[in-house]
Amino acid sequence: MQRDAMLIQLGYAPNEALINQLEAIEKNTLGYEKIQKHIMDLHDHLKVNNAYVALSNSNNYFKIKIESPTPELALEAHEKVKHFSEKFKVSLKKLQNKETYYIEGFSH
């Protein structure tokens, strides 16, 4: 998938800075080529839970942000993230005291 198309699918208006940021995240994400499609699928599946995949501004990772308005929707979003991680062998890092995960990459 082209970087412009990926940024648009994630809800960004592509520009040079975002393309460079996405490129740095791709290089930092272990086995990125194996999980790219699954990251985009997860983004689509999480929308109904007020959750999404985004570019982290503080680290070169994709982040999964859960902003669900109810505990039930939040729980469902966390379950989807867990399923994604287990099914596609994706290593995640949950941020302490936040509804956020970093996608570290493919874990063999």
Named regions from a protein language model:
Residues 1-108:
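Structured alpha/beta or helical-core interaction and ligand-binding surfaces enriched in interleaved
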